[in-house]
Amino acid sequence: MSDGIMHLLDPAPFGRVLPAMITPMKPNGDVDFDMAQTVAKQLVADGADGLVVNGTTGESPTTHMDEKVELVKAVKEVVDVPVISGAGSNDTAHTVRMVEQTQEAGADAVLVVCPYYSRPSQQGIFCHYQAVNESADKPIIVYDVPGRTGVRIALDTYVHLAELDHVKAVKDATGDIAGAVRKRMETGLTWYSGDDALYLPFLSIGAVGIISVVAHAAAKPMRELAEAFDRGDIAKAQGLANRIAPVIEAMNGTGFQAVMAKAALKVRGIMECTTMRLPNIGPNDEQIEVVRDGLRASGLIPE
């Protein structure tokens, strides 16, 4: 095995391509659990081998605990892939409650974002995850997204987090490839890209997969990209990365990603209602057309 694909020695316990799944809403704003099951099944049919529910793309700041629990149960009923539940907050006690209840509902792991807005110290970040670890009986995926949280998890903090029993993986949305190399090598944690545009670069430094918004539109070529990389067919992987670049640009460039993910499902004919809870607003006609053009340019829908 060449050095370029040594990352295969790392397990991918939660899958390779994991859509950060939207939460379908009815026109009145209620969660549409039946449609959630439809979307989950479609994403798995597309090539996803894991799903993340109740994340930011799933409008988690506006959904309530009972809805989060029911969403985990609904999705678990219809798919045979790992289902990870977002359980993050800037309130440690609330995070612990979410972890406990979504685990009880059947989540295979929890995705816990670094506490946001309050900008805690590195010691505070560690203590937050330590408290979550003490209440967890399933794996914890650390979510590092400084563009949203206002704080970056330091290398030394990662080293200490890796010593916690249930911390097993990282969703890295820092955009810092060089930093990810050191963090991954010095912690031994399983690494996932949290940035669609950096999917292939993250694979090249040892990530096992991606937690993705664009997988609502492109799970199949994203899975093929990972498989090509595994075979050492870098030219094929590069070609696939280039192919999906237009839809990545479309879904990243003109609106909140959850909005654009719902637009993509509408364009694909999977889901008609794109209602969102305030303060987010569903996609407008222009955003839908931008996504449609991106899907066409990537060869994901007919011209």
UniProtKB/Swiss-Prot annotation:
Q: Where does pyruvate bind?
A: T57, I211
Highest taxon of the lineage: Bacteria
Site annotated as Part of a proton relay during catalysis: where? Answer: T56, Y117
GO BP term, pick one: diaminopimelate biosynthetic process
Active site: which residues?
Y143 (proton donor/acceptor), K171 (schiff-base intermediate with substrate)
Cytoplasm in keyword set: yes
Q: Which SUPFAM superfamilies match?
A: Aldolase
Any one Gene Ontology MF annotation carried by this entry is: 4-hydroxy-tetrahydrodipicolinate synthase activity
Q: Where in the cell is it found?
A: Cytoplasm
Catalyzed chemical reaction(s):
L-aspartate 4-semialdehyde + pyruvate = (2S,4S)-4-hydroxy-2,3,4,5-tetrahydrodipicolinate + H2O + H(+)
Keyword Cytoplasm (UniProt): yes
InterPro entries reported for this sequence? Aldolase_TIM, DapA, DapA-like, Schiff_base-form_aldolases_AS, Schiff_base-form_aldolases_CS
A GO CC annotation given for this chain: cytosol
Q: Which PANTHER family match?
A: 4-HYDROXY-2-OXOGLUTARATE ALDOLASE, MITOCHONDRIAL, DIHYDRODIPICOLINATE SYNTHASE
The record's subunit annotation is:
Homotetramer; dimer of dimers.
Family that this chain belongs to? Belongs to the DapA family.
What is the name attached to this protein's record?
Answer: 4-hydroxy-tetrahydrodipicolinate synthase
Q: What species does this protein belong to?
A: Bifidobacterium animalis subsp. lactis (strain AD011)
Q: Which gene encodes it?
A: dapA
